[in-house]
């Protein structure tokens, strides 16, 4: 019997470790895949719906669905919400539905770290992260998997946010400073 699995952002974070994701991307990105241009549909109130399909022969089929509601900030809600649907590549059965915020942040950070692993000098010991948003901490955690950074500098337009992020990262054991 087949049952569709659901993974919350917390479950994605728990199960999707940075080192393993970097290695999965190293293997997966080396293989051809089909990733048509995303579809973007205009919704009322200047909102949008985006569809981003991807599939790889012999593997799965996925589609990320994203809504963008710019007015949500006034409601205390995130402007962007997303899910990722995974289907079996052999028979098309739905396998899983994942909240996509954590998935996207980790995939983006790990893709960046993978690129740095190929492009940065092996003896690189300093990392600069520009920005203090959601992605910044993920960038530090992922990049620290590919290099032994001795200095991690955080820069942001708001010095207080940069300092707070650096402090949080130091609590996690990273040599971060604003």
Task: Give the positions of each predicted feature.
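Structural motif
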Residues: 129-130, 155
